């Protein structure tokens, strides 16, 4: 069945979201139109505001509506000498949820991937190097994902940081708390054995 042009446009627009196929997009559109137009208008307004007003922090590159994000603008954390390098703003939220890290961040917005045309420039590494060259950074914690690209990115950044005599560390990888060994892949088990600590 062919829908009206506006309804078809709404369904197609919802399909841009990850994991949303044609049927899911259709259900979402019908839900908003049939049962919750007020929420649909609120969603449209929030989406419009976010798309026009949210940019990147000039210091760490996470999402913010201001020049600096709340962490970088904080007197205590913004002047921290420890920077944690992550791939995405979602990684910042995950680390913040743990409440254990009190330094500042640098968000790469991806990882090195020459085949996809993602090099050091696209990751903002010139800005990171300026932070390192300022002399205000004592430690760089590399928290890129444990993928081939994430590891390559971590090694590239570590080489860059060594030129500035900055302490470099990498977050640990291994068996998750509550995980069962029989379900853990061999690479993760190898990392767990190689990274074991004395008790």
From Swiss-Prot:
Residues 81-176 form the Toprim domain. Coiled coil: none annotated. GO terms for molecular function: DNA binding; zinc ion binding. GO terms for biological process: double-strand break repair; recombinational repair. Keywords: DNA damage, DNA recombination, DNA repair, Metal-binding, Zinc, Zinc-finger. InterPro entries: DNA_Rcmb_RecR (IPR000093), Rcmb_RecR (IPR023627), Rcmb_RecR_Znf (IPR015967), TOPRIM_dom (IPR006171), TOPRIM_RecR (IPR034137). A zinc finger (C4-type) spans 57-72. May play a role in DNA repair. It seems to be involved in an RecBC-independent recombinational process of DNA repair. It may act with RecF and RecO. Belongs to the RecR family. This is Recombination protein RecR.
